[in-house]
Amino acid sequence: MAATLAKVKAVKPDVLVVSGHTKGALTAVRQIAEMKVDVPMLAMTHCDAAKLSKQHGKNSQYALCASQWHKTLTYKDDFFKDGMTYDADFTKEFGYAPPYQAAESSAALLVFKDAFERANSFDKVKVRDALADTNMQTFYGNIKFAEGGQNVDKPMVLFQVMCDGDKCENKVVAPTKWAS
């Protein structure tokens, strides 16, 4: 990463996009700070998994991060209620905040429950057809499948690491409907 960041420092781009896994995100933020690389915008992947705001605090401030879910989104359902309730319940049960993978897995169970109920059967064709006809909202987001099986009704979330003193948090900045 150091060689790439040396080039970034010399070229002075307007945006640096870092995509990789957890270790790569942590390494990038650490080395950007150590090497005093100044870019107007840093966009990254894997910020949630890397716990970027907690691991690197102010060094990660203003990093823009794509994610599948954030607890502050206002989607609702009858089982988990909303993201904040899900977050509190999950944290109480497991001792840590839920990553988006836990949230999407919980939402998937709601989708299957709904499909089984609508199919009123365990017949695989009836269940498959019920899944294909899914159009519902969960605490995780809207669920509606395209012909190819993709959920086409839930946007990605973009958050930015924001710090107030030494406390750094992920704040949703897009979609603007949920910007904090």
Task: Enumerate the predicted regions with their spans.
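Extracytosolic ligand-binding ectodomains
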Residues: 1-180
